[in-house]
């Protein structure tokens, strides 16, 4: 995949070249999207809109730390949707990981989560965030046990993941109507990189065959159900719903 690669570390140690080779990235000086290695982290920038700033994965500080410490925990909609109850903490495959926010919430309340991400740039951002998270004294121990990244397309990987998870979680890219600055910034940069998930409808059936208990699909409240398969079961929040489908028991 072609993208502009920029090294701002000043170390001259070739780390960016190693990273590019690992993820199959090819430097393209004219690309509007840039993957930038800074002294702190790896980030994605839209070069023609510098005011949007860089997008990076941060499990340790910022919004994720606030959500972990002061969020709803087990009361969060995504936790309710996957079925967390009492001692039951399902094993989850997040088949559309993105920046890993929902996966992190599930891991922080005790679930084991395997994240699938097919876009190599997004996978590189996730991997960088995980590496910093794993090294953190406060969360590193449980994060290594509970949150993993698999760089693969869900369309193919969902058929051969072992062991089978109890829950498959899907949050396909869907055009957002929200006006919040964060969503607008991230969605603009993200959609410039990966575009909408035009093949997302093809994920529902393999997800239902893989999950032993249920499939959870996060949708904006104005979006039709995935693959136009309606379900009466959903956890509804302001602006979103988590549609719940039966999986395939062992």
From Swiss-Prot:
Keyword Transit peptide recorded: no
UniProt keyword annotations, A-Z: Cytoplasm, Methyltransferase, rRNA processing, S-adenosyl-L-methionine, Transferase
Enzyme Commission number: 2.1.1.242
Organism domain of life: Bacteria
GO molecular function: rRNA (guanine-N2-)-methyltransferase activity
Positions that bind S-adenosyl-L-methionine: 101-102, 117-118, 153-154, 171
SUPFAM superfamilies: S-adenosyl-L-methionine-dependent methyltransferases (SSF53335)
NCBIfam families: PRK10742.1
Free-text function comment from the UniProt entry: Specifically methylates the guanosine in position 1516 of 16S rRNA.
Protein known as: Ribosomal RNA small subunit methyltransferase J
UniProt gene name: rsmJ
